[in-house]
Amino acid sequence: MNLPSLIPVMTLKGVVFFPQAMLPLRIFENRYQEMLQDILKSERMFAVFAEREISSEDEELNEPPFEVGTVGLVRVSKQNPDGTSFVMLQGVSRIRARSIVQESPYRILETEAFNTIKVAEKLEIREKIYDAMVQNQKLGGDVTQDVLDYLCTLEDDIAFVDLAAFTLCKNTVRKQAMLEVQRLHKRAEMLFDDIMQDNLQLSLRGSCKNQNQDTENDRN
């Protein structure tokens, strides 16, 4: 898909959007309502960039975006009686911000493609990631059977890693770091390490709980 170089953008705190992911949004600010009206008349596309922390007291930019975000396609747009809108945005592609060309009435970025680099035809670590997710489910983690069932149907390794990261990674800074890694194998390794770390914490928590129960039983 050919993307325009100038793309309207929402800069959102704590939201890291990935290609292929579905992001429900409630549009209520005037600037974004105007943006939505404009894009629905054209490509139906806008980008979501996570808002980073202000780097210094001298920085004048409001809502400073990270360098890399994701452009999405509006799949559903429904206006509510109160004037707000419900939007379902599907991620299309990573993009890198080059400059801010407009702030009013809404922000527009000049961007460039930031495509994933896949060196090997087969992602060897994919099976290990899936096994780690199965273990996470058994340990009572965030992985559900629905997540497993959906991810295992994906033939594309890039979509598999991106959707798993979008669904399972809760730390915004870490999630943004995964979004910014171009090499698929490195991104997959980061995802695997996160799941294994979560599994370790869940396992230790379970062991402590069992020990406490055993101690309580001994007292009784």
Residue positions per predicted region:
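N-terminal low-complexity, acidic/polar interaction/targeting segments
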Residues: 1-220
